[in-house]
Amino acid sequence: MQMVPSLPPASECAGEEKRVGTRTVFVGNHPVSETEAYIAQRFCDNRIVSSKYTLWNFLPKNLFEQFRRIANFYFLIIFLVQVTVDTPTSPVTSGLPLFFVITVTAIKQGYEDCLRHRADNEVNKSTVYIIENAKRVRKESEKIKVGDVVEVQADETFPCDLILLSSCTTDGTCYVTTASLDGESNCKTHYAVRDTIALCTAESIDTLRAAIECEQPQPDLYKFVGRINIYSNSLEAVARSLGPENLLLKGATLKNTEKIYGVAVYTGMETKMALNYQGKSQKRSAVEKSINAFLIVYLFILLTKAAVCTTLKYVWQSTPYNDEPWYNQKTQKERETLKVLKMFTDFLSFMVLFNFIIPVSMYVTVEMQKFLGSFFISWDKDFYDEEINEGALVNTSDLNEELGQVDYVFTDKTGTLTENSMEFIECCIDGHKYKGVTQEVDGLSQTDGTLTYFDKVDKNREELFLRALCLCHTVEIKTNDAVDGATESAELTYISSSPDEIALVKGAKRYGFTFLGNRNGYMRVENQRKEIEEYELLHTLNFDAVRRRMSVIVKTQEGDILLFCKGADSAVFPRVQNHEIELTKVHVERNAMDGYRTLCVAFKEIAPDDYERINRQLIEAKMALQDREEKMEKVFDDIETNMNLIGATAVEDKLQDQAAETIEALHAAGLKVWVLTGDKMETAKSTCYACRLFQTNTELLELTTKTIEESERKEDRLHELLIEYRKKLLHEFPKSTRSFKKAWTEHQEYGLIIDGSTLSLILNSSQDSSSNNYKSIFLQICMKCTAVLCCRMAPLQKAQIVRMVKNLKGSPITLSIGDGANDVSMILESHVGIGIKGKEGRQAARNSDYSVPKFKHLKKLLLAHGHLYYVRIAHLVQYFFYKNLCFILPQFLYQFFCGFSQQPLYDAAYLTMYNICFTSLPILAYSLLEQHINIDTLTSDPRLYMKISGNAMLQLGPFLYWTFLAAFEGTVFFFGTYFLFQTASLEENGKVYGNWTFGTIVFTVLVFTVTLKLALDTRFWTWINHFVIWGSLAFYVFFSFFWGGIIWPFLKQQRMYFVFAQMLSSVSTWLAIILLIFISLFPEILLIVLKNVRRRSARRNLSCRRASDSLSARPSVRPLLLRTFSDESNVL
């Protein structure tokens, strides 16, 4: 009996990814021998827990997570200082805003977690049927244990990860959809091992005695390694290998199959679906980094203000009679307090007084803006694709503004730039090109050059080639007829994860060889004579991105064993006899230059003795539980040698609609586009010309195997080419200007082509003096090229390219877009990852930050949505710091007139409500709805994108502009009111207002000015903007009347009683408020007027030039200010 390996403690059961070793699962939880003791297994139960909190740990855990944010922790410290130290303001002023922010966030997270709890309970309490003692037993899903045999009916979801034992079909197959896991809606076929196919009843399945050895849980949906040991009465184990085709994943749905039986191998939080709950590594946008930098600057300003006021307080008190009057002598405790300690206490008090310069509510507003703003992408009807009946999807809202800051775009070719809708065009057999089909069934239409004729070229070779196309694939067949087997009259539907394979099978069908499907391990083919041929499928050597080929080993009805192989020319040519290559190579290169996807086809006969050895090696490799993939790859390499080349195929993959226009727009926007593909150079190069990545006047620089192999020493030749190309580019671009994007149109354009083997040579070059800087020189060349094509790239090489560019000086923002599993690595590596909802599965879309149906949607996503998102959030950030500096500066200036006594200028209610109620909604509405430029203009004039690149609106210049504007306005608020107070004319009875009235006037001017400033900046008015802007001002007035019109019993001092009403009873106060608001906004209004005059003048000159010039010219690009202040017409 096989013993259960040592298990981790129960606390480590869920979500552990870094486990080593294997686990043993006993089918039905029965021992394999009745005579030996059964050791109970310890695995996780089948409960799914996607929630973060429980009822008892929600409060401490949520608070801990929220106070890890620096701003929240800072305000907590301020609040504690107010509670413990005698500060000038009430703890409520900082405690209430902090409480509001914490409460809103906690409610949001608690509600989301409540929904997760509800969803978990629906899954955990669902009904399942377990086979126990040959009977169907009804249980709740959460009570499934590892080893239980589960019965699943049609259209039901698998409750855990199961190994398929049997199904209602005679061949032990079942159809599954995994739409809830990876978004793929097409049916996939899964298989049971042949020894358990017949066990299709509860009674028979209960007699099975077997043990499954498999890897520990890991999150990859497409990988599984295991074996099943089946014990007969003689206790002789029969071992069968298990792979992903035998594993039914939790969350997938059974389709077109009445029922199946499977044994649970992974349950609960160890299922692949649960392990995939964990999010991808957190990506931070450039705006977030700018916010942190601004916080540091304003924290420095805060500390400086507190230090200055503390110092000046003691300087002022050092003057005789300034410290204390004779009637207010110090107490004994105050006299005994150390002066240093008193100074430190005063310093803390000033920090509390000025702490509102740090915007605590900004984080909440930014989060709401990102979350709500992401819906505009999902709601955009232009992203809807009728073919797949889907639109765009936002997987993360944290990177919306990053879409407006992209410098480099890395794109896949197949399925991204092209349709991935393959059509068989032609083939080449033994160096002869065949195109089209004749009415004769005994020959193909052969064309060489311009001459078209029919020739009986070795009939056996033709049929061998077509049989290879019909047999060497993983295509599955679905017939609309439910009769026994496919017939000529039945309508065949081919299903495969690879559109190439479907195109080849359909191409063979055009020439008279029809693939009829796989039944009980036999592949059935109808030949040109309408005869049914059967081939026993012995082994499938699956395709992978490293090998770039796939093979099958079949046995004919005559008993011959054949290996058919198809793959890229670079993967097949080295494995066939050299004298067979040249004729076929000519056609392959010609087809590649025409933009077709090419595959080479080869075969070899395997002697029975050789097959016995091969079969033994394959079984041993498939049975391995450790390093199975590496062992199988080694066996595949040994098998796929000394083959005979038959021919090659050419498949057309049409360019996607508007792909060329999209790339042109990206180039015009200043973005550098790189194509990273696994295709051969000629095919990719042709596609790049077709999609206008390369222009006719683009000079191409090649770093490929072909150019490197001109020399005996590859590294020497590589070094020569790198130096040559760098000199040429440095001569063309003598200075590395900051605006190198504009230089593209002023100099000769260059494009670079590099293949995977040359890239490996660059990255892994020997560390001698001549080659240790290959990478640096290569990057210098790349930066000077307008476009780069990387062909023959492995998935990891794509990620290496992205990582190299990310680490360039200046940290350019990278975006990767692709549609297949081989693009996932570069999508995860880049700053922004975009997945195409393509025909090669949804792995790319599932691992991306955003997913769109087509490549053409990238244009609007970046040029319109990205532009607007960046402008909105950049304005939001600058505005928050601006309005808080306006808020605090009068408080700071007031200390010079109150003996630095820490006397607040504003009432505590105003301190509390300023950021929460009076000024928060207008900027939130602006940051969601603002369109400073029309969307059609943004997409039609890509050059506008360059105006905001490089995080332009959050650089030092705009930051200083907003800071000085706030300083100017804050000074006007305070000193304007102060000088108006010099006369007694503000009140009719000649009395002068008190300090609370003074502060209320300043605060009123402040609220109206910062709100009207936002109104001046708004270019796109909606009813929501009107409501929140004028509504906020009305609410402030109403609140002030309400707050000052009632004697509140919970207040010790009624400071504000009747202050606001008395203030507005004076006509002079009204005039003063209006005058100060106008003076504060006058620079803004003046700038608007000047910009409008300049705009009208520019339009008039442009009209004159157009009238005098017969050639149509594009409209000049209107410069976008580094702040969002408008030179467009204003509704206001």
From Swiss-Prot:
Record: residues binding ATP: 412-414, 501, 543, 566, 597, 677-679, 792, 798, 822-823
Extracellular topology ranges: 86, 312-346, 901-908, 977-995, 1048-1069
Outcome, altering residue 418 to N: In HACXL; decreased phosphatidylserine translocation from the outer to the inner leaflet of erythrocytes cell membrane
Tissue: Widely expressed.
Record key words, sorted: ATP-binding, Cell membrane, Disease variant, Endoplasmic reticulum, Endosome, Hereditary hemolytic anemia, Lipid transport, Magnesium, Membrane, Metal-binding, Nucleotide-binding, Phosphoprotein, Translocase, Transmembrane, Transmembrane helix, Transport
Site residues (Cleavage), renumbered to this chain: 442-443, 448-449, 484-485
Keyword Glycoprotein: no
Class in the EC hierarchy, top level: translocase
Posttranslational modification: Proteolytically cleaved by CASP3, CASP6 and CASP7.
GO molecular function (one): ATP hydrolysis activity
Record annotation: effect of changing residue 448 to A: Impairs caspase-mediated cleavage
Topology class, membrane: Multi-pass membrane protein
Di-leucine motif, short sequence motif: residues: 1116-1121
Phosphoserine modified-residue sites: 445, 1108, 1116, 1126
Annotated disorder: Hemolytic anemia, congenital, X-linked: An X-linked hematologic disease characterized by shortened survival of erythrocytes due to congenital hemolysis that cannot be compensated by bone marrow activity. Clinical features are mild jaundice and anemia. Red cells morphology is normal.
NCBIfam families in UniProt: ATPase-Plipid, ATPase_P-type
Family: Belongs to the cation transport ATPase (P-type) (TC 3.A.3) family. Type IV subfamily.
Protein name listed in UniProt: Phospholipid-transporting ATPase IG
Gene that specifies this protein: ATP11C
